[in-house]
Amino acid sequence: MLKSNDKLLEVSNIEVVYNHVILVLKGVSLSLSKGSIVALLGGNGAGKTTTLKAISNLLHSERGEVTKGSITYRSEKIEKLSPSELVKSGVIQVMEGRHCFEHLTVEENLLTGAYTRKEGKKKVLEDLEMVYSYFPRLKQRRKSQAGYTSGGEQQMCAIGRALMSKPETVLLDEPSMGLAPQLVEEIFEIVKKLNENEGVSFLLAEQNTNVALRFAHFGYILESGRVVMDGPAEELRENPDVKEFYLGLSGDKRKSYRDGRSYRRRKRWLN
C-alpha cells in the first residue's frame, strides 16, 4: 500500500531489562508508517521478539520491562495500556509459534479474535468471510480441530484470528518459522494483499531476510539488542553487508561467519 507518510508507531530509544538485571534492548528506535510493511531482521537473540513484546505490552509475563525511552501509537503513549486495551486501539500481535487453541475448531479459533468487538453478529460473520477469502484453505478446514491442522494452516489461522479484531496494525513474529519455502511465499503473498487491499500495516520480525526484504517497504537490522542498519528494503537487499551476513552472499561466493575478515567487519557495526 504505502500511500501515506503518517507515522502510526514510534519506538524511541527504548531499553528493556529482564529480571531487573539483564539488559536485552539497548536504545532501539524504529517507526511504522500508515499503510507500510516494515521488517525487523536479525538472528536468534538479536532482540526482535522482545521489541514486539515491548510494543504489545507482553513483557511483564516474562519479568521484563521497558526501563528507558518511549513507545507511542498515533502520538499517544501506549506503555501503560494492557494488551486488551491495545487491541481495542488497533494493534495486535501474532505470537511466534502460532499458539492456536488446539481443542477448538479453526472457525472457533477465528471467532475468538472478535471478542473485543461491539458490532453485531452479522458484521463479525462478514469479516469471517473476508478472512476466508484470503485464506481459502481455512474455509476448507473450518470444522477441523486446530491441533490437527498443518503448521502452515495454523499460521494462517493465527493471522486470521488477529484480523478478526479489525486491527490497523499487526505485529507479526517469525511468520516463516518451521514452514516449507512454498508456504512461506504463500503467507507473505497474503500479507502483501492484506496490506494493499485492506490497508493493514505490518511490523514483522523475521529471520528469513531474503523473503522479508522482498515483501517489506522498509527494514531494520538488529544485532545484540541494537539497530545496526536500517533503510528502504530494496536498498538493504543490495547492501554488501546485508548480502554478506544475512543473505549469505558476497559477490559470487557464499560467506561464512567463521571467515575472520567477515567477523571483524561485523564487529565494527557494534562499536
Regions found by a protein language model. Give the residues of each.
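The feature captures the beta-strand-to-loop junction immediately N-terminal to the Walker
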Residues: 41-43
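ABC ATPase signature
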Residues: 104, 149, 162-163
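ABC ATPase nucleotide-binding domains
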Residues: 248-271
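A short, proline-enriched helix->beta-strand linker immediately N-terminal to the Walker B motif
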Residues: 164-168
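Conserved ABC ATPase signature
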Residues: 145-149, 153
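ABC ATPase NBD Q-loop/coupling interface
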Residues: 58-59, 70-86, 116
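Helical segment within the ABC ATPase nucleotide-binding domain
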Residues: 185-199
